Amino acid sequence: MNHLEGSAEVEVTDEAAGGEVNESVEADLEHPEVEEEQQQPPQQQHYVGRHQRGRALEDLRAQLGQEEEERGECLARSASTESGFHNHTDTAEGDVIAAARDGYDAERAQDPEDESAYAVQYRPEAEEYTEQAEAEHAEATHRRALPNHLHFHSLEHEEAMNAAYSGYVYTHRLFHRGEDEPYSEPYADYGGLQEHVYEEIGDAPELDARDGLRLYEQERDEAAAYRQEALGARLHHYDERSDGESDSPEKEAEFAPYPRMDSYEQEEDIDQIVAEVKQSMSSQSLDKAAEDMPEAEQDLERPPTPAGGRPDSPGLQAPAGQQRAVGPAGGGEAGQRYSKEKRDAISLAIKDIKEAIEEVKTRTIRSPYTPDEPKEPIWVMRQDISPTRDCDDQRPMDGDSPSPGSSSPLGAESSSTSLHPSDPVEASTNKESRKSLASFPTYVEVPGPCDPEDLIDGIIFAANYLGSTQLLSDKTPSKNVRMMQAQEAVSRIKMAQKLAKSRKKAPEGESQPMTEVDLFISTQRIKVLNADTQETMMDHPLRTISYIADIGNIVVLMARRRMPRSNSQENVEASHPSQDGKRQYKMICHVFESEDAQLIAQSIGQAFSVAYQEFLRANGINPEDLSQKEYSDLLNTQDMYNDDLIHFSKSENCKDVFIEKQKGEILGVVIVESGWGSILPTVIIANMMHGGPAEKSGKLNIGDQIMSINGTSLVGLPLSTCQSIIKGLKNQSRVKLNIVRCPPVTTVLIRRPDLRYQLGFSVQNGIICSLMRGGIAERGGVRVGHRIIEINGQSVVATPHEKIVHILSNAVGEIHMKTMPAAMYRLLTAQEQPVYI
């Protein structure tokens, strides 16, 4: 018998068995680090003798087997030792009750104030072991004191001792806390705090069945209480592990996080039913045995404290069923304390279940493999690409069957549905992205037969392709010249068809057989597709279309192409910049026949207007801001032609001038066009021959506009015609000129309130090359063909083109410019040699 310092040794001998052999029951327990650091006071060490299981306990277990199955509990008992414990070949393996599957909170193991708490490593083989423990385990050959945090108490009274029965229950102290201590959950991870019950039962054929029943009920209640606590923890944290990370409750208990303490602090109202359940569960096991036992037998269960026991020593407290052996006073207090603790544990378990149910109702359980949905939609600006597809992807349908519900005219087919019947999703995506462009959801009403949305996607007309021809044209011919060119193209194609019918060789490039085609029109381009094969026959960007004419059921489409130039021509143009205005352009004229000729022409014209709106949108300008009413109000504030009407209406500015000269002598002047956009388009005196009749008279100045010569008006006539009229005065000795005095430099005043309003003219190399009719620039005095000399007092004669454009684009308010005809500027700067007439 070993003796430990500061502890009393107690030996319990089994006299009935007639043996003096004493064995110690060793518990394989692991001590947490917290308790290793804290030195506890020495405790009494208890040694027990060797006993055998009696038949009475087996009979008792048989009687209670049915109840065990109903409750789903398995009380595992063992009374032997197992090999391999503390450098010995025998190890005591304790009974692991079913509640050991569920861990208790590791926070109890980490609490330094609870000196009686300990951790026991759970071994999965314990369940299998307990089934065969009684038959297979060998006897222990050594004695050993139990750890000081194990609490060992004997269950004995006078009758039990006489029957040579002594039962011992090895257990740790329940998670008792003082009233002032904060509550901590008795839950733990896998391998956390566990309860192991070790029971040794000697040969006791006369064992009192009620004592065994009481022990069984106590152990079963403890198992049920801790199992419910662990179950509550698992239910409470199921929502935290609802992503499918665990495959089983065992694995869930193993990897479950610690309980959230804040969730237990929330107060809940427990109804009467839950209160009754708690009361029933907490008192069921304690009252059942007592109700069945006579009062006399109940009184016998309160013997004095066994010799050597220390009921008042710290850390030694038996469960409620065993505290009857402690004493009448201590037993009642300890029993109430234990009962209170059990009720607290049951209350917490019920509370956990209710919380888990509420959270499951309100929380969506989602698989971790489910991708997160974006919280808010993501909007992306449309890239600067053509909304129409390339020719290879186009599959138009016949134009005779327009799409239902479309506002396009009869005979037109929207390409958003007809070109791509197999890709409706992409077409709708383009529409939606286009609607979000610059946050302008609507279009300003554009006159025309088609829906602007359809023109952006593209519409298709059915037509017959008659042929194509080429013409040479000036850069900016008049409308009448355009119509004459269209008629000439039609006549050429008809002549070519007649030659083809007569089987005569037609001129090269002008004979094509009649072909059924689909004419694709959009704000980006115009394509001619073969109706059968859908191959692209011709493809012209919309910006290259210079003219469209409908003559009856004939449609003429003119596209501009610059004629290729040789190096010699480039050298000539470099030395003579005036040749730029006389440059010839190659016009490709396509002739079609269609019943919808007028609709085709109107649709192309509407496509230009919609394309302009798209341009405004791309630059952040709302087309609605440029409404007709608002723009009209702006024009009303603009000075008409910079007071040109007032200047021309003054009599002192308009004069009749008589020039005397010799017969056969030229007048000696150089004239240029006043420029398109002037209030009275006519010719201007750009230069005068030194010593000539015009200069010697002293009545003419450079910049004067000639209204008429000898009664013949020059207003609105081409420059070449005016030159011919002046040359015809060579044989006359007296010439009458009606002129309007004008300075050589024209002053322009444009009022632009903000950047929303476009100036309405374009500039190339400092020369105004186009002008929007009726715009603020035209009313301000801007004229086509004039060179910009000055902008807001700053000379731009030697300024690069890009800088001029930048200055004009960002100018607001009153914009003052000075311009003069480009030809006059070249003559005055000696860039050209004058040709006098």
From Swiss-Prot:
It holds the Pfam family PID. InterPro entries: APP-Binding (IPR051230), PDZ (IPR001478), PDZ_sf (IPR036034), PH-like_dom_sf (IPR011993), PTB/PI_dom (IPR006020). Residues 399-418 have a biased composition (Low complexity). The keyword ATP-binding does not apply. Signal peptide: none annotated. The modification Phosphothreonine is found at T305, T370. Residues 226-314 are annotated as: Munc-18-1 binding. GO terms for biological process: axo-dendritic transport; cell adhesion; chemical synaptic transmission; gamma-aminobutyric acid secretion; glutamate secretion; in utero embryonic development; intracellular protein transport; locomotory behavior. Residues 457-643 form the PID domain. Residues 1-93, 238-342, 358-435 are annotated as: Disordered. Composed of an N-terminal domain that binds Munc18-1 and LIN-2/CASK, a middle phosphotyrosine-binding domain (PID/PTB) that mediates binding with the cytoplasmic domain of the amyloid-beta precursor protein, and two C-terminal PDZ domains thought to attach proteins to the plasma membrane. The autoinhibitory helix linker occludes the APP binding site. This is Amyloid-beta A4 precursor protein-binding family A member 1. It comes from Homo sapiens (Human).
